[in-house]
Every structure is written in C-alpha cells, then in structure tokens.
C-alpha cells in the first residue's frame, strides 16, 4: 500500500479558504500568528512529483503538523494515511481502530460502542471523545505531530476537540461516488494475523494461505455500509463548517498515487510556508 509512481501531474485541488484579512494590526512570531498567516494567504497549487522512495520530511523550526482527514467509509482514508505517515512521520490516529480495540477488550464502553456501530449510528460522544483526546495527548503525538483519521464526525465532536485545544492545520476531505463506496466496503477483508486490509477485487491477497484466513469486519456488510453512509452524509456538512477556512477537497475516485499527489502538494506547501514565514514577517 506504499506503492508510488515516478511522476504524477495531479488535477487541480479544490481549495476552500477564508479570504478575510487578519483582524490584528500587527503580527508576532507566535504560533497563532504563523497559523493566521497560513490561513489567510492566497495559495497556488502546483503539480507534485512522487519520488520512487519516500523520505521523512521534518518541519524545521516549526510546530509539528496537525492534520485531519475525513471521508465516507471506504473512501480511501486508510491508504492515504499510510502514505502520509510514511513520508511525513506523523502519528496516525484512527478513531475506528480505537473503537474496535475497545470493543475487543470486552469493556462496557466497547459493548455500547458495538451496539451503535451495528446500527450504523455514531458512537456517543462521551465514549469516543475521551479516547481520541487521550491519544492526541500522548508524547509521540505532541512531538511528531498527528494525523487524525475519521474524526470528528459531528459538529459536537469538533467542538469538544476544539475545547480541549486540538485544532488542525489542514482538514482533508476525500470525495467518492456512493456506488463505488458500497462496492469497496462489501469487498473489503481483514487479515487477522497482520492487520492488513485487502479487497477481493481491487487488492486481493497474495497467497491462498492468506486468502483462507481473511475475515470481514462486522460493519462491512452492504446494509450497514448504507446506514453508515446515510449517517455520514447527514453530519459531514456541519463538520466542514467548523473547518471551512482550512479545508481541501480531494477527488478520491482516482488511483492512490494520484490522490496522494494532491495531498502531498498541499502538505509540502504548508511546510514551506511555515519555514519561510519568519523571514516574511520581518521583511
């Protein structure tokens, strides 16, 4: 899932940014000022080239990246998160994985979470918010930066995270047609030994030995997928309104390399703007 191509010319990224001028009459070199500068500058996108081998990119003399990625079930978030974390060294935090681990533990919260997930409903905030908060607060997340996958899924969850002081630098949205999403979900399989995700059609297992041990997640049936999509569609606009000035929308119905090229272009430019911001402010 970390494959790449030599050269990709990505399609234009639809970028949504707040155009109002900063309210402050002057800037300092604080984190708030740098974040404000990024949010209010006009951004131009240029094609990104994916090298044959990724190298970790560090943001010198700046705060670590804080990224959120959102999309409907099977929109490709997991694949893109692997590519992003491999290149940028961020800590990948999947709300779904946190919930599934809680369910596997047999705890009361896990039992309650499973009941809601089986119905295609959002897990109550009081269960999941603290799980995500605790993971974001761990040392590795604070030092390396984080990539929050599939969360927040409602305006109330976004508000709770903001109240705890967690604000992303960029909010990435993957958009894929619904019929393709259903096909992706139903054909998805999990290797319980390695944790790797396969797809019976698009990414089949390498050997028969792996094929016979694959399992389907309990929430990956067509019926539950449709319920989850309905819930996602009902909540996504409210979430986007919380991050409209830092949101980029990516067409996810492309090859993983093409999708990553668009994301990589945005992240690389964000790092470049951060690293050049001090000299710009002093000039």
From Swiss-Prot:
Region described as LID: spans on this chain: 187-220
Any one annotated GO CC term: chloroplast stroma
GO terms, biological process: energy homeostasis
Catalytic activity: AMP + ATP = 2 ADP
Keyword tags: ATP-binding, Chloroplast, Kinase, Nucleotide-binding, Plastid, Transferase, Transit peptide
Binding site for ATP: 74-79, 188
Entry's family note: Belongs to the adenylate kinase family.
Protein name, entry field: Adenylate kinase 2, chloroplastic
């Amino acid at each position: 899932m970390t494959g790449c191509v030599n050269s990709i010319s990505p399609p234009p990224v639809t970028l949504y940014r707040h155009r109002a001028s900063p309210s402050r009459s002057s800037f300092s070199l604080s984190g708030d000022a740098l974040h404000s500068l990024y949010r209010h500058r006009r951004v131009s996108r240029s094609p990104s080239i994916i090298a044959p081998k990724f190298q970790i990119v560090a943001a010198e003399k700046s705060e670590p990246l804080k990224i959120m990625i959102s999309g409907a079930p099977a929109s490709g978030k997991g694949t893109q998160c692997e590519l992003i974390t491999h290149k940028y060294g961020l800590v990948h935090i999947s709300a779904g994985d946190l919930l599934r681990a809680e369910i596997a533990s047999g705890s009361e919260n896990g039992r309650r979470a499973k009941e809601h997930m089986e119905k295609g409903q959002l897990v109550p905030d009081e269960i999941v918010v603290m799980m995500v908060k605790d993971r974001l607060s761990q040392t590795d997340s604070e030092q390396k930066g984080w990539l929050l996958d599939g969360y927040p899924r409602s305006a109330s969850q976004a508000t709770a995270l903001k109240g705890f002081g967690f604000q992303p630098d960029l909010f990435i949205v993957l958009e894929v047609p619904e019929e393709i999403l259903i096909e992706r979900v139903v054909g998805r399989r999990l290797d319980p030994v390695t944790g790797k995700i396969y797809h019976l059609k698009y990414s089949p297992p390498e050997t028969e030995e792996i094929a016979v041990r694959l399992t389907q997640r309990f929430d990956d049936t067509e019926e539950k997928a449709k319920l989850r999509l309905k819930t996602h569609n009902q909540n996504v606009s409210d979430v986007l309104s919380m991050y409209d000035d830092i949101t980029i929308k990516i067409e996810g119905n492309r090859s993983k390399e093409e999708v990553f090229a668009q994301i990589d272009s945005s992240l690389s430019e964000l790092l470049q703007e951060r690293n050049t911001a001090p000299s710009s402010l002093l000039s």
